[in-house]
Amino acid sequence: MASKLTDRQQEILDLIRLTVSRTGFPPTRAEIARALGFRSPNAAEDHLKALARKGAIELTAGASRGIRLKDAGETIPPGPETAASALAGMADAVGRLLLPLVGRVAAGSPILAAEHVEREVGVDVDLFAQTPDYLLKVRGMSMRDAGILEGDLLAVKRAAEARNGQIVVARLGDEVTVKRLQRHQGRIELLPENPDFSPIVVDGTQEFALEGIAVGLIRTQALH
């Protein structure tokens, strides 16, 4: 068990835990310094060494992200707003976005409902021409020929309208689907990009809503 920590050391430890849980990797010294307002990474290094001496973390020499939590299996909620706001500041400082990763969507509930969000993923701002609001885990191969494969993460920007030909996330009744939007003579079609799947024609009896437009794609291999 770690020795008693100072308030500042606890704040840094909470930040490390939150960063690891949301992005899968620890912050660098420079990121900690920017997030918590230190003058230099050396100040962060001093606090990290103190945390290591007290048994809260282990440090790997020569590695910028060489921080390992000693209680990695323990889930500890972050302290008041400090760690969460610091993490958001860190993401801005290093040009990264923290996006909610949406998995399976339950019938009838909002796509960003808490129970749908598997975790948050840190991604490079420069990956996208437009800033996405969330990542949707792709299920199925109906958009294969557009290069969107099972397990990929589709970057989605919330939108209630879309142009013809755009790839959209649409809610049709109780189902959420990724398809190419086509409007023709007042009729809406959701087109797959795989000849093994049939177009979906939206008729007036079905509840239809756009949940967003696709603004980018992340291959799942890129996260490992």
UniProtKB/Swiss-Prot annotation:
Family annotation (InterPro entries): LexA (IPR006200), LexA-like (IPR039418), LexA/Signal_pep-like_sf (IPR036286), LexA_DNA-bd_dom (IPR006199), LexA_repressor (IPR050077), Peptidase_S24_LexA (IPR006197), Peptidase_S24_S26A/B/C (IPR015927), WH-like_DNA-bd_sf (IPR036388)
Site (Cleavage) residue list: A107, G108
Entry protein name: LexA repressor
DNA-binding region: 29-49
Record function comment: Represses a number of genes involved in the response to DNA damage (SOS response), including recA and lexA. In the presence of single-stranded DNA, RecA interacts with LexA causing an autocatalytic cleavage which disrupts the DNA-binding part of LexA, leading to derepression of the SOS regulon and eventually DNA repair.
Alphabetized GO MF terms: DNA binding; serine-type endopeptidase activity
Active site (UniProt): S142, K179
Assembly behavior: Homodimer.
Its EC number(s): 3.4.21.88
An individual GO BP term: DNA replication
Enzymatic reactions: Hydrolysis of Ala-|-Gly bond in repressor LexA
Protein family membership: Belongs to the peptidase S24 family.
Top-level taxonomic group: Bacteria
Record's keyword terms, sorted: Autocatalytic cleavage, DNA damage, DNA repair, DNA replication, DNA-binding, Hydrolase, Repressor, SOS response, Transcription, Transcription regulation
